[in-house]
Structures are given as structure tokens and as C-alpha cells.
Amino acid sequence: AEAIAAWQAGAAIVHIHVRDPQTGAPVTRLDLFAEVVERIREVSDVIINLTTSGFHLDDPQADEIRLQPLELAPDICSLDVGSLNFRGGVFHNSAEWVEAAAQRMREAGVKPEIEVFDLGHIRQATHLIDAGLIDDPPWMQLCLGIPWGIEASVGSLLEMQRRLPASARWSTLAPAASQLPMTTHAL
């Protein structure tokens, strides 16, 4: 319902995470993603961006589970490059998994939204582009102010922008009170 309301308010893209209907906890369940995608596609032409984050997964099959949303043929899927300390744990994105995920997205015809949380993540994304795993132009999401990633400041935003590949299309996000200042400066 929130994605459809956002589209009705003028959003061109919706980024989707799903939650357990009983507990409200973040989950990576293909059936829930499928239900959300179906409901959105029934009434709108909004661009659908499904997450592949899986930071909450504690499963030996997590790497494969994270890529299940590709089965739904979304327009876009997030591709988190690099690992990050996050919410009392580690948001693990090995170089091998990132490369495999980029390849799977390319084969599926899904545009990756390359989420970068620190400067080193831009280096890894550039490697993926140079290796032909991500088509040019790439779309980079500069994620600022996420705990233990790069701080949400104008200086950080400018430095991230400076290091992007020349052809990159980019956008930015930041949590809570940092969102408006970061998106304003991004314009």
C-alpha cells in the first residue's frame, strides 16, 4: 500500500523490503516479495527495486536466498558492495558474492542499484564495471550516515561524488534528519 501511495504521489521508483506479517521482522521471503510485486503491478507502472540486502539472514544458504527476488523480474535490484558493521553484527558482502550477484543481475536483465556505504565500496563497484559485470552507465546509490559507514556530511558527499566513475548516474540516501540535507546538496 505504501509503494502504491508513493507512486500516486509522483514517485518513479519504489524500493521494496518485506517483513514477516506476524512479527514485523525483516525477512527475505520470495512469496512475500511476489505478493508485493503483483499488487504493485496490478495498479501501477512504477519502477520496482527489490532489495537483496539480507543483513538479517542467519542461514547457510543466505547468499542464494538474497538473489531469489531476481526470479520476479524486477526492473532494479539493490547490490550492496563491500561489508559493513551494522546493527550489532556484520553486513557481509564478500567480493565473490558481489561479483556473482552482479553477473546474475546482468544475465537476468535487472539493473543493479549499486549501494555504496564507504569510499572503498566505490573502488569495488568500479572494479565490477571495469570487469564488464555491470553495464555502463552504472547507477550508484551513495548511502551516507549509516552507522559505521561514511558520515552524512557535505564533505563526504562531495568526496564520494568525486570518486565515482565519470559515466555514473547517482542518487543519495541518508537516515532520518540527515536525508533532507544530503538530498538537497546532491541536487
Model feature map: region roles:
Residues 8-13, 45, 74:
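A structural motif
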Residues 76-187:
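Catalytic alpha/beta core domains of metabolic enzymes, predominantly
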Residues 1, 24-32, 65, 89-97, ...:
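Alpha-helix N-cap and loop-to-helix initiation/capping positions
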Residues 11-21, 48-52, 114-115:
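Short beta-strand segments at enzyme active-site cores
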Residues 7-8, 70, 106:
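Non-catalytic positions within long, well-ordered alpha-helices that form the structural scaffold/packing
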Residues 55-75, 79, 83-88:
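Glycine/small-residue-rich loop that forms an oxyanion/phosphate-binding "nest" at active or ligand-binding sites
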Residues 24-52, 100-107, 159-167:
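Alpha-helix-loop-beta-strand connector modules within alpha/beta enzyme cores
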Residues 12-36, 143-144:
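Glycine-rich, proline-tolerant flexible connector loops at the mouths of alpha/beta enzymes
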